């Protein structure tokens, strides 16, 4: 059966990667508990490539930034929709009472999308 993948490309300040990792660790726990098949968060390492459009240019990274490439794997698009609805309303994903939550990256610069897998393991 074909799988479904949510993909993310997230420009982020290098000094905020640690805070993002904490958030992503919680996200992984929640998405996996609700039925995701796999969950990856990957931070840029070899971004100066000679082929194609390097992530540095694609994301217009500043000198103090890197990029996170992340993806979550689901059994199907229907499963993805069900799991996302549960995960996004999970109480652990909600801001603590009386505390304002600020994302560790610029929400206007990140990219996301859903993808039908046509080759997978």
Provide a role label for each language-model segment.
Residues 3, 26, 30-34, 97:
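N-terminal pre-domain and mature-chain start segments
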Residues 1-26:
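Long, hydrophobic N-terminal alpha-helical segment
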Residues 19-32, 67-73:
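Generic detector of contiguous secondary-structure segments
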Residues 32, 38-63, 89-121:
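Glycine-rich beta-strand-turn "strand-cap" elements at beta-sheet edges
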Residues 18, 78-80, 120:
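Residue-level signal for secondary-structure boundary sites
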Residues 21-27, 83-90:
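Short amphipathic alpha-helices in soluble, non-transmembrane regions
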Residues 5-12, 51-87, 113:
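Short, well-ordered beta-strand segments in beta-rich or mixed alpha/beta enzyme
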């Amino acid at each position: 059966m074909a799988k479904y993948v949510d993909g993310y490309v997230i420009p982020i300040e290098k000094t905020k990667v640690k805070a993002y990792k904490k958030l992503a660790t919680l996200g992984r726990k929640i998405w996996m508990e609700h039925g995701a098949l796999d969950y990856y968060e990957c931070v840029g390492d070899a971004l100066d490539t000679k082929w194609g459009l390097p992530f540095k240019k694609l994301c217009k990274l500043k000198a103090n930034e890197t990029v996170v490439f992340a993806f979550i794997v689901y059994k199907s698009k229907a499963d993805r929709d069900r799991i996302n609805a549960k995960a996004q309303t999970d109480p652990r994903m909600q801001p603590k009472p009386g505390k304002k939550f600020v994302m560790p990256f610029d929400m206007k610069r990140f990219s996301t999308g859903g993808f039908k897998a046509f080759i997978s393991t």
